[in-house]
């Protein structure tokens, strides 16, 4: 799992950049959803003329298709945990170019907040979620292992600043699990001159190569990966010796900087996770390539 947070002011093209980065995923999700809608209509048609008893038998022998969506802009932990526990999803993403929608949403307010933060932390660390129901509703209880969740939130400085000052979001380790980026604001330089007008993202060879790779990885056809160990259906990519040495030096550098009077003395929750986050990001890049 990766939790990503990006700062960008209103008008900084947050939506444009995210749509460009997620283009292949969005198109894939749309195709899958159209197939799901057709399957659902067929399923409904199959039981439309049946009586109640036959309809129950039909539903038992032909369960309805599941919504294949994995991208969400606003979903509660309770809902996403249910999708994991029920085996509908193994991977999901909460992505929004309005981070205020998440930080100001139902999950982050009221009595459920601390429980949700703990759940997100557990999901990040162990890929584990648990749902417990009352004895009268045991069918709703269950666990899911080795699941993944990606946060990809973008928001204005004012929104992220308030979140980063929140002692609960910091103290419970929720925000320290995020990778924060603050890209340069290009406002004032984005002139639509002749050079700009001659460019087309859809014909840029770099973007085409990126989208093509995304499409390949999204393809459901199995790809042999015999050189990597499988762990519950997920590939484990080991670090070579050079990577281990780089990781060790990186870890020790950040550990020393957490000492008294050092740069990260008061940011230990963030600094202590730097090495882990770097390993996760490197693994995603290695797998993508």
Regions from the language model: what does each represent?
Residues 2-150, 154-163:
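Conserved ASCE/P-loop NTPase catalytic core
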Residues 31-33, 38-41, 45-48, 122, ...:
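Phosphate-sensing "switch" segment of ASCE/P-loop ATPases
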């Amino acid at each position: 799992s990766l939790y990503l947070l990006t700062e960008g002011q209103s008008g900084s093209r947050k939506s444009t950049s995210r749509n460009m980065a997620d283009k292949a995923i969005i198109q894939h999700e749309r195709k899958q959803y159209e197939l799901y809608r057709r399957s659902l209509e067929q399923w409904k048609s199959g039981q439309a003329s049946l009586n109640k008893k036959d309809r129950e038998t039909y539903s038992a022998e032909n369960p309805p298709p599941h919504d294949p969506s994995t991208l969400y802009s606003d979903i509660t932990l309770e809902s996403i945990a249910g999708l994991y526990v029920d085996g509908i999803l193994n991977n999901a993403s909460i992505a929004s170019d309005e981070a205020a929608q998440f930080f100001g949403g139902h999950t982050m307010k009221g009595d459920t907040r601390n429980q949700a933060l703990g759940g997100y932390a557990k999901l990040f660390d162990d890929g584990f979620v648990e749902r417990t129901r009352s004895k009268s509703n045991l069918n709703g209880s269950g666990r899911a292992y080795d699941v993944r969740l990606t946060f990809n939130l973008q928001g204005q400085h004012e929104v992220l600043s308030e979140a980063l000052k929140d002692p609960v979001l910091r103290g419970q380790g929720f925000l320290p699990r995020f990778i924060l980026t603050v890209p340069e604001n290009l406002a004032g330089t984005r002139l639509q001159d002749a050079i700009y007008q001659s460019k087309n993202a859809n014909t840029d060879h770099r973007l085409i190569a990126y989208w093509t790779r995304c499409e390949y990885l999204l393809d459901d056809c199995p790809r042999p990966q015999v050189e990597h160990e499988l762990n519950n259906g997920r590939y484990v990519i080991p670090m070579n010796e050079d990577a281990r040495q780089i990781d060790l030096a990186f870890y020790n550098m950040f550990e020393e900087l957490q000492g008294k009077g050092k740069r990260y003395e008061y940011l230990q929750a963030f600094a202590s996770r730097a090495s882990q986050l770097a390993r996760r990001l490197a693994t995603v890049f290695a797998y993508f390539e």
